[in-house]
Curated annotation (Swiss-Prot):
Protein name, UniProt field: Condensin-2 complex subunit CAP-D3
Species of origin: Arabidopsis thaliana (Mouse-ear cress)
Chain positions of HEAT repeats: 20-58, 98-136, 184-222, 231-267, 269-310, 331-360, 361-398, 417-455, 457-493, 494-532, 821-859, 878-916, 917-954, 956-992, 1053-1091, 1138-1179
Source organism phylogeny: Eukaryota, Viridiplantae, Streptophyta, Embryophyta, Tracheophyta
Gene3D superfamilies: Leucine-rich Repeat Variant
SUPFAM superfamilies: ARM repeat
Length: 1314
């Protein structure tokens, strides 16, 4: 009876169910009726319902579309509808409707969407309350885990699983081949479920949900539901958003379905296989541009390709090769996919067992494509290609065969023809690329190639890596240190060792702490550890060497090199190079303070020196000819500061006796007999380092030997016959030994004071004696000796006296340095005599023993040394410095001796530290040495002033900054590199606004322009002449390029806002000044300033990185943070456009009129500049130039002409390349360094190419016509017969009208000149 009542209510509800409130009862009654087991009632129901099927479908569809109760009513209606279709004896095709099926799918989507907390309230609140208890029962697990409640915020997970399970069952007998829209909607809905279900992952068994979705999608991949290929294509399209999303379960589901289900079905279905092979290509087209999502897309593509068959993989590789020639977004995807393909797919270099492996290799094509993309116009693509090529090199360097093929592919094999040297040239360009990311990637590639090549690299690449160690960016410097250290780690050739030592140790002075630490680490590993290993293996090696008494010097050198492995001799020799030793000292000091120096290093160095001596003696060579390996004593002197207990006194005492007894003059006489050269400078250097070592370990020496050594040193000092380098070492060692000899510090000071004053007194007597001798000889009128031998002896005596006086003066300075409080009152007069000799206006003429000759000419060494010693005395005595500073400045300015000027620069910069306020007025005179004719003086001045500026002893003000600019274009490459590092790294951090504040002034100064009323110099012509030294005057190409190089360097230091401000300042202070008459454009320097301004405004460095229509990709910062970057780009573009319209364009219009009125040649430069400025605003030129229609027309014409010329040039290149290819000529490996990718340029290039081909054909016809061949008779030519106007043939004579038409045919003119 209840079933009868339900049946009646359902039928009544269908007939009058137009109200949405009746749908709930209808759905509930229908579900209750379908749950009954009475077949008779159900058959009656089906019969009654069939007569009103349309009304029923309308009502049930409306219920499934209902948003009531947050979609719960709709999902209950869907459950009831599916239960109806699944019930026994149900007339399925009567009750199945595409519209109702679409409503069912919509109800599933809406039920899974995010719910609002307030949903279901209002008019339905009572119904919610009434059903709460009913829905809130603890329903157990059909669809979720651990028996948790089946709902959360109104979501019933169990109900959802029931609906999906019934949907899958319905699809087994309801075929959708007749309903393509329903099939499409089903695929889309099921593909969306993994994403929509994320909000309910807490109450859903997500894995089971994915399994059910996979079953539904797999079920429709059946011929019963239509064409499988079309269905698979629709599924692939619908799963694409999941495949392209980040790491998530939904993405894993999509990848699993495609790589397993689709791939398994495609094996036996050619049409389905075609769909599957096209899916990765479709994903490539849909891949996003931002870096991280693009990476996920690449991973998805690779997973699908890996699951494909070999044929499909090969087809996709060919597709990737074509992508490399496409648009920028495809090219960047291609370079990201290639390394993954090579590392994931099998046999990239062909079958190892096949003899024709190279022919079957698809990997070589990929490598070649990567190499080509390393020269792409997009910096992002260049950087990605270089870094990915580095990954490929690392992956393929595993076995010997792969290494050999890879070397051949990259052009490193002598046997390869094409591409030889291409990668080397490529690396040289990319390591100095304008984009930092490209330089970093290039250095990474160099590091990987170093391992491949075993460190044997072209010298230019090594120098490029060394130069990169001075890059302005920290990351580039780190990469460069890593790259060149890897080369040195693998290869110990002399060229690699030398370049490493000249590039890496200097990084100990870097501002970045991490780079300093890396420098210490690699020095410890590659220098000290290598020396330590060499010391450990010496004994067995030396024992194995043959003992040959008839040994030449070359054989001995060879034996010594064989004695020390890993190029240790070259390493030690370069360590004591004057350009390397200061950094080695700094590194050893830093390692020593951190207690990282191992005692075994000192023992190894002693072992190296001992074994070298033993080998020398074993060849029966005279011991007085022996010298230790170059650099060994130097490094021992540096490490012994912190390893004094590891150095043996017997060892030092033995070698001191050897070096001290060497008589250079006597040895020179025996040199020819022994066939070995004698190098006295080597002994002097070794003695200095040995004395330094003795000083370092003096506190460990026994008392008696220390006293004996001190007496010996004092005697040698007082003889004044030492080399200047040895004097300092002797003096310092003697001071240290005095501390050892004395029991207290006061006693030690008294001992030092005693021998310092004793030595100074003797030195002053020697100097005075020489001066008096020179003066008396100048007054002597004795007839010169006629005998040559007597004259020679006399000259030799004078030379020895001069040498002794020079050493004496130098010794005084050394003594003053170690004991500043020494009494110098008796020494100053004699030094004053020397440095003022020849001056008739000397103030002390009657008080001091003046030299009657000019010692500057008679004894230049003594003259120079006296200035140096006086400088040391001034450092110890401020009052003395105050008296003599004017003399130092005067001599620095007037001296014609480069060595003296160099020493004076050193002295003056030392004064800057000790007497900062006193020396400030002399800074301009010091900076003049930046333009000194001697390179050494210029470099020394630059380095010393740079250090003072970094330590704030000198300020960047006045002319100092402007004079430093000239070092950027110095003739010396070393100075240019130092200047680039100063401006690009140090100054950019220390004074970031300096380039901006001084930019306009720099333009006037560099052009030596005084034609501006605001920049004119009121001083005399003499000051202008002085300023000319620091200018680059002239309008020639060389001068302009030098100035432009300086401007570009300054622009690179500016922030974007400063570039905008600089643009405005140039327009206001130069262009506007010229149009207002403040800048005289008839003056040559004024014209140069104006032309420079035009060039600067048109250069790319002053333009901001985000321009109109430009893509968002850059190399340094990829597309991350796209919204912020886009907003910033719009703001910058708006600011530039506003500035152009309001400020720049009116100035240009006024200035153009002025230049035209004066017939100035600068009009062309102005037009070129304006064309470059407005090329990004082609569509707005009419609006911008509304005030000057003529200028508007001229600019449009110039732009069109420029673009046409550019297109014609590219077309000519393309035609030439095509011709050479047809003629069998090999194409360039890198094709083109500049692949222009402009939106409108491609069509113009195609059009121009067609014109070029047609013109070429026309020229060939003209050449044949002009070749002298006579025109054949008309009867011999194959031509159609002509009839007269009357229809009668005129006996072989052509009609007059036809001849006239031929006369009027168009003439082809040769345009070879175009």
């Amino acid at each position: 009876m209840d079933e009868e009542l339900l049946l009646t209510r359902i039928l009544a509800g269908i007939e009058g169910g137009d109200d949405e409130s009746d749908y709930h009862e209808l759905v509930t009654d229908l579900k209750s009726l379908l749950d009954t087991d009475d077949d008779e009632i159900l058959n009656r129901f089906y019969g009654s319902l069939s007569s009103m099927a349309s009304s029923f479908l309308r009502c049930i569809s409306a219920a499934m579309d209902s948003p009531v109760e947050s979609g719960r009513l709709a999902i209950l209606a869907s459950d009831a509808y599916l239960s109806l279709l699944l019930s026994t004896n149900c007339p399925v095709f009567t009750f199945f409707s595409p519209i109702a099926f679409l409503s069912l799918l919509g109800s599933i989507r809406r039920y899974l969407k995010r719910r609002d907390d307030s949903a279901g309230q209002g008019s339905n609140s009572q119904r919610e309350k009434g059903n709460k208890k009913k829905r809130g029962r603890g329903k157990r697990n059909l669809g979720y885990e651990d028996g948790e409640e089946t709902e959360e915020g109104g979501f019933d997970a169990k109900l959802m699983f029931i609906v999906l399970e019934k949907l899958g069952s319905v699809l087994s007998f309801v075929h959708l081949d007749r309903f393509p829209d329903s099939l499409k909607s089903l695929v889309q809905t099921v593909s969306e479920i993994p994403l929509l279900a994320l909000e309910h992952s807490g109450v859903l068994n997500y894995d089971r949900l994915m399994e059910m979705c996979g079953k539904i999608l797999g079920g429709v991949l059946n011929s019963d539901h239509g064409d499988m290929a079309l269905t698979a294509a629709e599924i692939s399209k619908s799963l694409t958003p999941l495949l392209l999303m980040g790491k998530h379960q939904a993405r894993s589901f999509a990848l699993g379905f495609v790589s397993r289900k689709l791939m398994s079905l495609a094996k036996d279905n050619p049409e389905l296989k075609k769909v599957v092979s096209n899916l990765p290509k479709f994903l490539v087209h849909k891949a996003p541009e931002k870096a991280e999502p693009r990476g996920f897309a690449v991973e998805a593509v690779l997973e699908i390709v890996k699951a494909m068959e070999v044929e499909g993989q090969s087809e996709f590789v060919d597709f990737v090769m074509k992508m490399c020639q496409g648009k920028s977004n495809f090219r960047v995807l291609a370079v990201d996919i290639i390394p993954l393909l090579i590392s994931s797919l099998g046999n990239p270099l062909g079958d190892i067992s096949s003899e024709n492996g190279l022919k079957d290799s698809w990997g070589l094509g990929c490598i070649d494509a990567l190499v080509q993309r390393c020269s792409d116009t997009s910096a992002l693509i260049r950087a990605r290609a270089l870094s990915n090529l580095a990954q490929v090199v690392e992956f393929l360097s595993g076995d010997e065969r792969s290494r050999s093929i890879l070397k051949q592919a990259l052009g490193f094999n002598g046997e390869t023809s094409e591409g030889k040297g291409a990668v080397t040239d490529l690396l040289k360009k990319r390591c100095v690329d304008e984009k930092a990311a490209v330089r970093r990637a290039a250095l990474l590639l160099v590091t990987k190639l170093t391992s491949l090549m075993g460190g044997c690299f072209d010298g230019s690449i090594l120098k490029t890596m060394g130069t990169s160690c001075s890059d302005p960016l920290i990351s580039i410097r780190k990469a460069a240190v890593s790259a060149i250290s890897e080369a040195f780690r693998i290869c110990t050739d002399e060229i690699v060792t030398t370049e490493w030592l000249h590039s890496v140790p200097r990084m100990i002075m870097d501002n970045e702490t991490s780079i300093q630490e890396e420098c210490e680490n690699v020095f410890h590993e590659l220098v000290l550890e290598r020396i330590l290993r060499a010391g450990n293996v010496l004994s067995p090696d030396s024992a194995s060497l043959p003992n040959n008494r008839n040994t030449t010097s070359k054989d001995l050198d060879r034996d010594i090199e064989a004695l020390f492995p890993e190029g240790v001799l070259v390493l030690l020799r370069e360590l004591c190079n004057s350009e390397v030793s200061p950094w080695v000292t700094k590194i050893c000091g830093s390692l020593g303070k951190k207690k990282r120096l191992k005692p075994r290093v000192a023992l190894a160095l002693q072992c190296i020196i001992k074994e070298s001596e033993s080998l020398w003696l074993s060849r029966s060579m005279p011991i007085n000819r022996w010298t230790a390996p170059a650099g060994a004593w130097f490094l021992l002197s540096e490490v012994s500061v912190y390893l004094s207990k590891s150095v043996e006194w017997e060892f030092l005492h033995h070698h001191w006796q050897l070096l001290d007894k060497n008589d250079v003059q006597g040895l020179d006489e025996q040199g020819d007999e022994q066939g070995v050269e004698c190098n006295s400078s080597t002994w002097a250097g070794d003695r200095v380092c040995l004395l330094q070592t003795i000083s370092n370990v003096s506190l460990q020496l026994p008392a008696e030997p220390a006293a004996d050594l001190a007496d010996n040193l004092l005697k040698k000092i007082e003889n004044f016959n030492l080399h200047s380098a040895e004097v300092d070492a002797h003096v310092k060692a003697l001071k240290t030994l005095c501390k050892k000899k004395a029991s207290t510090s006061e006693e030690a000071d008294m001992l030092v004071k005693k021998w310092v004053e004793q030595v100074s007194l003797k030195a002053s007597k020697v100097t005075e004696k020489y001066i008096e001798g020179v003066s008396s000889h100048n007054h002597s009128f004795v007839t010169p000796a006629t005998l040559g031998s007597r004259r020679s002896k006399r000259l030799d005596t004078v030379s020895k006296k001069l040498s002794k006086a020079v050493t004496a003066v130098y010794t005084i300075g050394s003594c003053v340095i170690i004991y500043p409080s020494a009494d110098t009152t008796k020494i100053v007069p004699f030094l004053h005599t020397v440095i003022t000799s020849g001056n008739s206006d000397s103030k002390l003429k009657n008080k001091l023993p003046q030299a009657n000759v000019c010692l500057k000419q008679k004894a230049p060494l003594l003259y120079s040394q006296s200035w140096l010693t006086m400088a040391k005395m001034c450092l110890a005595d401020g009052k003395l410095a105050k008296r003599y500073l004017p003399l130092f400045a005067q001599e620095l300015e007037k001296s014609d001796c480069a060595a003296l000027r160099n020493n004076l620069v050193v002295a003056m910069t030392d004064f800057c530290v000790h007497y900062t306020a006193m020396i400030e007025c002399y800074i301009p005179k010091i900076t003049k040495r930046l333009r000194d004719p001697c390179e050494v003086v210029r470099r020394q001045t630059f380095i010393l002033l740079s250090r003072l500026l970094q330590r704030d002893y000198v300020k960047w003000r006045g002319v100092l900054f402007l004079r430093f600019l000239l070092s950027l274009v110095d003739e010396s490459e070393k100075i240019r590199r130092l200047a680039d590092f100063l401006f690009g790294s140090i100054l950019k951090v220390k004074a970031p606004l300096l380039a901006y504040n001084s930019f306009v002034e720099a333009i006037y100064v560099l052009n030596d322009c005084h034609a501006h009323t605001g920049h004119s110099n009121p001083d005399s012509k003499q000051s202008r002449t002085k300023d000319q030294v620091f200018s680059i005057r002239g309008n020639d190409e060389r001068a302009r390029s030098k100035r432009m190089q300086i401007y570009v360097t300054l622009l690179k230091q500016m922030a974007p806002e400063h570039l905008l401000a600089t643009f405005a300042k140039l327009c206001a202070e130069i262009l506007a000044a010229a149009s207002d008459g403040m800048l005289n454009i008839e003056d040559v320097t004024g014209q140069s300033v104006l032309q420079d301004a035009f060039q600067i405004l048109a250069c790319k460095e002053i333009r901001l990185s985000v321009s109109r229509g430009a893509s968002s990709e850059t190399a340094d910062i990829e597309e991350e943070g796209g919204d912020a970057a886009t907003a910033k780009g719009r703001a910058i573009t708006h600011a530039v456009r506003k500035g152009l319209i309001q400020n720049t364009i009116p100035i240009f219009i006024e200035l153009k009129r002025l230049l035209e009125s004066k017939n100035s040649p600068l009009t062309g430069s102005l037009m070129d500049c304006l064309r470059v400025l407005l090329k990004d605003y082609k569509n707005e030129i009419e609006e911008m130039l509304v005030a000057d229609k003529q200028l508007q027309k001229e600019l449009v014409y110039d732009m069109q002409k420029h673009e046409a010329a550019k297109a014609r040039s590219m077309a000519n290149q393309g035609v030439a390349c095509g011709t050479s290819h047809r003629n069998g000529e090999p194409e360039a490996s890198a094709a083109s360094e500049e692949n222009v990718r402009d939106s409108g340029l491609e069509s113009r290039v195609v059009s121009a190419a067609a014109d070029v081909v047609a013109a070429k054909a026309a020229r060939s016809v003209l050449r044949e016509v002009n070749g002298g061949a006579a025109t054949p008779p008309l009867s011999a030519m194959s031509v159609p017969k002509l009839r007269s106007s009357r229809g009668v043939s005129q006996s072989g004579r052509p009609s007059a009208d036809v001849l006239e038409s031929l006369r009027r045919r168009p003439t082809f003119m040769s345009d070879d000149e175009s």
